[in-house]
């Protein structure tokens, strides 16, 4: 089956399930056999259902096997091989819904009810976007959100991500994303339309299967992390799940970049390509075709081609010669600080809130104004420590408590 198409692999797995069902194998065992075979297929390895005990076992696998030492040697060898492979992928192994319930500190019955009713446990609201349209947020209720955080911390956070992914991960930011594209003759920016809504529950289910989890576990995890058939914008699990779904997209685009000599990175739904060869823009139709094949649509009105003769910005960072903040943004911050020192701070807070759509501008709290302004200055410091340091020095002289 090595090198087989996705359709051929799924036919093989379907036949594998059918053979075991006809042999009256327990459904839970069929799930594990399919999951183990899928791990081989995902790595283009020959499928081996009698692997023997691995030579080396990680401590968590040893502990698990010790607790289940009563099972037959054949079953023990199979579970040892399966659990070790999952652990080597940087993931926690989950054999069945009861195992998942234990990890999430829920009873199996409670887990089942929570998964079945998950769609009803969200509340929706809208927030304004920069272009004037509204973004709909689907936020989980406290109980579901706490379970999603456990899924994030115990299952998703350890899964390997693409090196091209710059958003929603530790030690990466809009600054590290911008640094990858400094000093290039051409920078191309593409934006994916309806990023989270286009990642359907079917894709999430397929992701959990590809990670090696049994169908019963993958189904529960999908129900707990999707809403109305897609990734919800307000769930804590959605950002990491989007990165995991995009691993193949990232791998394909970065692979083209290696061959065609351009840099590629992705920050959430913002895709950036840069090169010293201005002719790389001729690849745009092909790149958009790859993106479409991976189930996404490019928001064409937001496509930007930036050449070295003008300002080049990547996720808000100017990248012409070195990472920097746009002069206009620095001038605005200087003006706000100056006006606060010379005039009415509360008036400045109201104007600041109104210009950014931050609720009722007349009642915008000074504490929120101070925190927001300080956050913007700290952002400048991360990109340009010298300029940011001067802004911070001036900021500290504002008489907020006067």
Q: At which residue positions do the language-model features occur?
A:
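Right-hand nucleic-acid polymerase module
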Residues: 1-127, 134-136, 140-160, 165-186, ...
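Catalytic palm active-site di-aspartate
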Residues: 189-193, 234, 238, 257-276
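Short aromatic/hydrophobic-glycine micro-motifs
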Residues: 213, 262, 295-296
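Acidic/histidine metal-binding catalytic segments
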Residues: 213-221
């Amino acid at each position: 089956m090595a090198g087989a198409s996705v359709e051929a692999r799924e036919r093989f797995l379907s036949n594998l399930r059918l053979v075991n069902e006809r042999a009256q194998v327990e459904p839970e065992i069929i799930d594990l056999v399919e999951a183990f075979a899928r791990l081989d297929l995902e790595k283009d390895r020959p499928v081996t259902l009698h692997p023997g005990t691995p030579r080396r076992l990680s401590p968590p696998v040893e502990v698990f096997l010790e607790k289940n030492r009563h099972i037959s040697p054949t079953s023990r060898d199979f579970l040892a091989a399966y659990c070790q492979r999952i652990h080597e992928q940087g993931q926690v192994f989950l054999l069945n819904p009861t195992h998942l319930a234990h990890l999430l500190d829920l009873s199996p019955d409670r887990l089942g009810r929570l998964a079945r009713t998950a769609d009803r446990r969200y509340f929706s609201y809208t927030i304004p976007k920069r272009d004037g349209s509204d973004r709909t947020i689907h936020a989980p209720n406290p109980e579901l959100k706490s379970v999603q955080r456990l899924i994030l911390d115990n299952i998703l956070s350890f899964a390997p991500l693409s090196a091209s992914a710059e958003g929603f991960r530790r030690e990466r930011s809009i600054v590290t994303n911008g640094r990858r594209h400094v000093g290039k003759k051409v920078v191309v920016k593409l934006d994916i339309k309806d990023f989270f809504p286009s990642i359907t529950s079917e894709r999430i289910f397929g992701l959990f299967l590809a990670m090696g989890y049994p169908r019963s576990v993958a189904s529960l995890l999908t129900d707990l992390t999707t809403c109305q058939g897609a990734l919800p914008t307000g769930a804590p699990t959605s950002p990491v799940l989007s990165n995991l779904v995009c691993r193949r997209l990232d791998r394909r685009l970065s692979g083209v970049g290696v061959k065609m000599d351009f840099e590629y990175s992705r920050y959430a739904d913002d895709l950036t390509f840069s090169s010293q060869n201005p002719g790389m823009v001729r690849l745009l139709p092909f790149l958009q075709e790859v993106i479409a094949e991976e189930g996404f649509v490019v928001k064409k009105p937001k496509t930007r081609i930036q050449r070295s003769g003008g300002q080049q910005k990547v996720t808000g960072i100017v990248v012409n010669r070195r990472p920097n903040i746009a002069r206009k943004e620095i001038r605005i911050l200087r003006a706000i600080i100056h006006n606060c020192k010379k005039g009415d701070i509360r008036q400045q807070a109201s104007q600041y809130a109104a210009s950014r759509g931050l609720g009722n501008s007349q009642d915008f709290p000074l504490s929120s104004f101070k925190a927001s302004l300080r956050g913007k200055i700290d952002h400048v410091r991360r990109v340009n420590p010298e300029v940011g340091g001067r802004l911070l020095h001036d900021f500290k002289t504002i008489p907020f408590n006067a």
